[in-house]
Amino acid sequence: MAPGQTASRPDLEAFDYATRTPFKAVAKQLIDILGAKLVAYIAGVREARAVQQYAHDNRSPRHPAIEPRLRLALRVARFISQHDSKEITQAWFMGLNPQLDDRSPARLLREGEIHEVGPEIVAAARAFVVGG
């Protein structure tokens, strides 16, 4: 298998894609899947206009934690949206998730340390996709 190929592992494909994609495209695709308001919430910015600027105007995030948050959000959003609709993916990010002690993935991404909450969120997404 050639480097970068992930065979039949959509979770690995989503990881590879979110890691290699330029940040501008990360923001644009997240907006397409989750909507600008939810992406702004995850990023921890006050206005959806800021994430629109990340996607369209070459604006860089002011806080260094924003890019890793949005890359992880894209990884999970792509993985879930390969199996469900955008609406289901949005609901998954906003809903109280029993795999996450009834906390929403969006809130964890916004407020948590990515190295702590990231593995929990990825595991919850895998459980959701496998379990429906």
Give the positions of each predicted feature:
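Non-transmembrane "mature" sequence context
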Residues: 1-132
